[in-house]
């Protein structure tokens, strides 16, 4: 991306929520966005997910240029998926897990069956009977695993992760991060991780941006991430 500028309305005017001069993320890389609340990190993720369209600049995603003010079309709708901090953002509380997992494939006209859904669940350490449960019958860590499985149903090339472990206790956080690390090795997909926690980003990412008040404060490579996390 080049000269990305994201604005929001404020009263009768606008304010700039995010400015990035240039950013390039390689295929198969895990890239981190670090910052506090209101820093602009989640704003960037929403632009890349097609959820926020009021921006200016040049953005190319998986080889395809994005157009401001336009919804994703074609392959991008399948190739870009997102995992939220709150799994209920993608899991309907009144739907069994079976329905939530088959929905992405059903909407896109792709085949699905219980056997493939069970295999997906077992791959992330969840038993087959999870299909018949409701979200509230699962622990927070189990719900997040289901949300990850749902995001992977369309075999995306880019997985956007918005604070996926911040609501979990430390042990479960480590389990989810290790799961994401293993999935990345297996699939080769690109991941972009948003987090306020330096250690979380250092655990998973190759490089990162440190963002504050909508501006890039620091560009961090693997060594810098490890050093800052060690001193955190």
Language-model features, listed with the residues they occupy:
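Conserved ABC ATPase "signature" region
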Residues: 114-129
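The feature captures the beta-strand-to-loop junction immediately N-terminal to the Walker
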Residues: 34-36
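A short, surface-exposed alpha-helical micro-motif characterized by mixed small hydrophobic
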Residues: 201-203
